Amino acid sequence: IMGPCAGGAVYSPAMTDFIFMVKDTSYMFVTGPEVVKTVTNETVTSEELGGASIHTSKSSVADGGYENDLEALLQIRRLIDFLPSNNVDGVPTWPTFDDKERYDHSLDTLVPDNPNKPYDMKELIIKTVDEGDFFEIQENFAKNIICGFGRMDGSTVGIVANQPLILAGVLDSDASRKAARFVRFCNAFNIPI
């Protein structure tokens, strides 16, 4: 979404697999701030009502919010590089420059022996995917679970992982919905998880 999307037009993006928004310039709502003021006598801004910050962190309607149009387009291209052309084609394979025999000694201590001690699962993911390239989906929503795309041996994989640093990685309703939606997408496009 680049710019305002209001009224009936807002239903179309909701039916897509991924929605990206531009911070402070894109808005998505059925009814704008003026109508809200008239009906409820509450004053809200377009950003508070349906901006990128709301849809990426609270409603989970958008999968990513970016600083400007160019960054949004670059991130969309990056996502497309991970995805098959359609639900029949296999996952794309890219050449990797990682040494097949690489060994990261920091992985020996990243996960603590004490199961009650938190650690950063995102750090573990980045250290295990090809070239540390991980594309996270809904990074600012339900942070207690991580969903995104990476590559292993050049092939796209979907990654779902609890994040022990946030709420001890517990699966609450938001995290469960986020993970289920991501798993459903991966299943529809034959992306291994």
Regions found by a protein language model. Give the residues of each.
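Terminal amphipathic helices with adjacent charged low-complexity linkers/tails
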Residues: 67-125
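Non-catalytic terminal/interface segments that mediate subunit docking, oligomerization
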Residues: 117-193
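Conserved catalytic cores of soluble enzyme domains
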Residues: 1-88, 191
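Short acidic (Asp/Glu) and glycine-rich catalytic loops that position anionic groups and cofactors
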Residues: 32-33, 53-60, 99-107, 158-163
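Short hydrophobic/aromatic-rich motifs at helix boundaries and adjacent loops
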Residues: 24-25, 96-97, 154-155
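Short acidic/polar alpha-helix capping motifs at helix-coil junctions
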Residues: 18-20, 109-112, 159
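Short capping/connector residues at structural and topological boundaries
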Residues: 33-35, 40-44, 49, 54, ...
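Short, exposed beta-strand "edge-strand" segments with a Pro/Gly-rich flavor and a Y/T-containing core
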Residues: 38-44, 60-67, 110-119, 164-171
